[in-house]
Swiss-Prot record:
This is Cytoplasmic tRNA 2-thiolation protein 2. It comes from Scheffersomyces stipitis (strain ATCC 58785 / CBS 6054 / NBRC 10063 / NRRL Y-11545) (Yeast). Pathway: tRNA modification; 5-methoxycarbonylmethyl-2-thiouridine-tRNA biosynthesis. Belongs to the CTU2/NCS2 family. GO terms for molecular function: nucleotidyltransferase activity; sulfurtransferase activity; tRNA binding. InterPro entries: CTU2, Rossmann-like_a/b/a_fold. Keywords: Cytoplasm, tRNA processing. The gene is NCS2. GO terms for cellular component: cytosol. It is found in: Cytoplasm. Its main location: cytoplasm. Disulfide bonds: none annotated. It comes from the Eukaryota.
């Protein structure tokens, strides 16, 4: 273990725990020595503080009648952070059951979106879920496993999208014969790995909100650590989604199908190294689901999130873990965009558009090429023109304009004109899905 690591493990140490002052410490973090029990209590305290609201407490009488029994959806990837959040929340429910004669302050639903094939995982989530749920008896924990293909619930929404050179986007409806795309097929049409990563985030967020709506949950919680949130701030900024930073780092509410959901990050004040230490101490790491894909060492083959993850890992290893806290505190100053006028919603990702990205891009784009000076340069120009003239374009008579945000313009840049890009387009004026269609979105405990 590096001396610069934010968590320093102590083996056979005489150092006394600075909290209880009764037993030897097992690790040092934030310049404080902790024994096992005090460190576990310290991490769990972060979640307790985040979910201190009356909604998550055991309620009686008038308060129970007014608030009712809350239902919380936990996004479980199977990674160490989501497993730690599950343990922390389930332990709270165990304490409530013990202290209140079997009563709980809220119901807990675990949701996993199956990434076994997509991420080449070392085990299926179905292998660990029964073990995980049994671990916290007598807490009654529900769990759902969704296929990523659940994202497609109305094929009539799937259209071919093309980004023009003036940054406008047009779409064309597909015939029944053409409309055979799966989610995996659509992702393969992404111009690069970062674009695929960006659109996967859109898919996951949509599936989580749909499930929360169907399951009548009021709160959605994510296991993001402080390090992960700092990572998200940088990644969103690079991907052109700066207007969404405030939603990725702070507790907030979102509207979906005319229902309001509370989004919480209970581990937002915990470093990733501390999450790993917690998992080690309570032996949660044996349940962790990991990708077997070996990340490339060549920078150009990495996604934006890979790059930002490597950046913060390097900072942790060199003694600058506090940088994550600085990034998060800076990001917290970025509230929701304040604009009186809205350009509707992006029909690809669903975010609200506050400024016309096409107009801004036209203003900053240099349209005149540098003068051609050599024969080699002229040859490249000729090849470029030939490629443009030979590429298929959508039949403009059967197309219609698409409302698209700056982040999705960045994501679609580089998509091939002959294949274009295929995606289920949303209505530009609302973030709602057709209620009749959503009613067909059936969930089971073992859906695949």
């Amino acid at each position: 273990m590096s001396e610069n690591n934010p968590v320093k493990y102590l083996a056979d140490s005489d150092t006394e725990c600075q909290r209880c002052k009764a037993v030897p410490a097992v690790l040092i973090t934030r310049k404080e020595a902790f024994c096992k029990n005090c460190f576990i209590r310290f991490i769990r305290g972060k979640q307790r503080k985040s979910m201190i609201d009356e909604r998550y407490k055991v309620k009686y009488g008038a308060v129970q009648e007014k608030i009712g029994q809350q239902k919380v959806l936990l996004a479980l990837s199977g990674g160490v952070s989501s497993l730690v959040l599950t343990d922390v929340v389930a332990s709270l429910l165990q304490e409530q059951i013990e202290s209140h004669k079997g009563r709980m302050g809220f119901e807990l639903v675990l949701l996993n979106i199956d990434e076994f094939e997509l991420e080449s995982l070392n085990k299926r989530i179905e292998e660990i879920l029964p073990i995980l749920v049994e671990r916290y008896a007598p807490v009654n924990i529900q769990y759902k496993v969704l296929s990523i293909e659940s994202f497609l619930i109305d094929r009539a929404m799937i259209q071919k999208v093309l980004l023009n050179k003036d940054f406008t986007a047009i779409a064309q409806r597909l015939s029944d014969e053409q409309n055979k795309y799966t989610v995996a097929d659509m992702l393969k049409l992404c111009p690069n790995k970062s674009s695929m990563e960006d659109l996967l985030t859109v898919i996951y967020e949509e599936l989580i909100l749909r499930t929360a709506f169907i399951e009548n949950c009021e709160t959605i919680i994510y296991g993001h650590s402080m390090t992960r949130i700092a990572n998200e701030i940088l990644a969103l900024t690079v991907r052109g989604r700066g207007s969404s930073v405030y939603k990725a780092i702070a507790d907030h509410t979102v509207q979906f199908m005319d229902k309001e959901f509370t989004i919480l990050f209970p581990l937002r004040d915990v470093l990733f190294a501390e999450i790993i230490a917690y998992a080690d101490l309570i032996e949660l790491n044996k349940l962790e689901v990991k990708s077997t894909i070996v990340k490339s060492k060549i920078t150009k083959n990495l996604t934006i999130r890979d790059l930002t993850t490597n950046y913060f890992s390097h900072l942790d290893a060199t003694g600058y873990a506090s940088t994550a806290s600085t990034v998060v505190k800076t990001g917290e100053k970025l509230g929701a965009p304040q604009f009186k006028h809205s350009y509707g919603r992006c029909q690809i990702c669903g975010v609200e558009i506050y400024q016309d990205p096409k107009e801004w891009l036209r203003r900053i784009t240099v349209n005149d090429a540098a003068p051609i000076e050599t024969e080699e340069e002229q040859e490249y120009v000729n090849l470029y023109k030939e490629a443009l003239s030979s590429s298929e374009t959508l039949d403009t008579e059967n197309t219609h304009p698409v409302n698209i945000c700056y982040g999705c313009i960045v994501t679609l840049s580089g998509a091939k004109q002959d294949t274009a890009f295929v995606w289920p387009l949303k209505d530009k004026d609302t973030n709602h899905e057709d209620k009749k269609v959503l009613d067909e979105y059936i969930l089971t405990d073992d859906e695949e």
